[in-house]
């Protein structure tokens, strides 16, 4: 009888961007943060109390999309300081910055010394202004209703199951290669 346990983990072909593109001339820049926020459901966002951290930053324009992992516990990260400097340059640009639940992401950006300048568009607030009686304001629900697209979480959930973790609450424990495809969809 063998005591050996065999594991078969899902693999991913995703790799992070190889450079930091100059996006300062874009008209609109969408930004979404992936975070480790362990007590968000109990105490609210961790950025005001320094409880948690940013694990990656997804950025998209009309010609570019990329996920920049910076603090995944299982690796695959880019240089944190270089990435934050690049994001600061983007946030200083004249482009409209687009977020979903902007107060959360901007709070984490500010906790990392990044100030967002210029116009900010929040898709969650916009959705409430369009239809205050919606049942759900999640990005997935809005995507289905307004652009007929559904974000695929299958790869993320499968990897999380392989690693024995919660796909959303413990995303920070996964290697970046499993989070990248998910994060770039936002």
Give residue ranges: language-model regions.
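Long, highly charged low-complexity segments
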Residues: 1-50, 80-91
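Active-site-proximal helix-loop-helix substrate-binding element of RNase H-like nuclease domains
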Residues: 2-9, 52-185
């Amino acid at each position: 009888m063998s005591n050996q346990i065999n594991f078969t983990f899902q693999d991913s072909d995703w790799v992070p961007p190889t450079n930091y593109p100059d996006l300062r001339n874009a008209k609109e820049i969408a930004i979404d943060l992936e975070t480790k926020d362990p007590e968000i459901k109990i105490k609210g966002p961790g950025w005001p109390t320094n409880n948690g951290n940013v694990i990656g930053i997804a950025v998209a324009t009309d010609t570019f999309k990329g996920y920049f992992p910076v603090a995944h516990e299982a690796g695959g990260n880019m240089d944190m300081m270089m990435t934050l400097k690049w994001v600061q340059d983007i946030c200083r640009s004249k482009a409209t910055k687009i977020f979903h639940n902007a107060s959360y992401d901007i709070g984490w950006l500010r906790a990392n010394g990044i100030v967002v300048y210029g116009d900010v568009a929040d898709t969650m607030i916009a959705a409430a202004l369009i239809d205050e009686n919606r049942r759900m304001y999640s990005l997935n629900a809005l995507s289905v209703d307004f652009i007929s697209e559904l974000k695929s979480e299958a790869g993320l959930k499968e990897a999380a199951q392989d690693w024995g973790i919660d796909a959303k609450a413990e995303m920070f424990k996964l290697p970046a290669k499993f989070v990248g495809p998910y994060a770039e969809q936002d």
